[in-house]
Structures are given as C-alpha cells and as structure tokens.
Amino acid sequence: MKLTCVLIVALLFLTACQLTTADDSRDKQEDPLVRSHRKMQKSEDPKMAERCSNFGSDCIPATHDCCSGECFGFEDMGLCT
C-alpha cells in the first residue's frame, strides 16, 4: 500500500515537472537554419565567419546575406534593410 502511494506521488511529481518545463520553453526555439546562419555571421573565426552586406547594399532575398538578416526586394535583387 505504501509503495503504491509513493509511486503515485512520484508519477504526479514527474508529470508536473514535464508540464512546467513545456510551458517555459514555448516560443523560444528558433529555426535551426536561421540559428546556424546567425552563428556563422557573428563568428570571430575567419574560416567560419561569413561576409554579410551592410544596410543599403545589394542582396539576394533567398540567400539572407544581409548583416541585419533582412533583404527587401524581389526574387533576384533587393536591398539590405
């Protein structure tokens, strides 16, 4: 009887921990491709660092090559904002 009560309490405790953890991590996960791209742009290692275009420079929206990460334009050509 005591063992059953201990198991039930442990199960309830673990369930509560899972629910609390799930609520805290909501909307914090970033798309892995965007996260790795930002890591490469901010890297101090010259081999890993990627050159990015400054504000007002030409860019290609599909490549996300602006330092700000935002390229305003059409498929082939745009400007970094």
From Swiss-Prot:
Residues 23-51 form a propeptide. This is Conotoxin ArMKLT2-0311. It is found in: Secreted. Expressed by the venom duct. One of its GO terms (cellular component) is extracellular region. InterPro entries: Conotoxin (IPR004214). The presence of a 'disulfide through disulfide knot' structurally defines this protein as a knottin. Residues 1-22 form the signal peptide. Keywords: Disulfide bond, Knottin, Neurotoxin, Secreted, Signal, Toxin. Belongs to the conotoxin O1 superfamily. One of its GO terms (molecular function) is ion channel inhibitor activity. Residues 23-34 have a biased composition (Basic and acidic residues). It comes from Conus arenatus (Sand-dusted cone). It comes from the Eukaryota. Disulfide bonds join 52-67, 59-71, 66-80. Residues 23-45 are annotated as: Disordered.
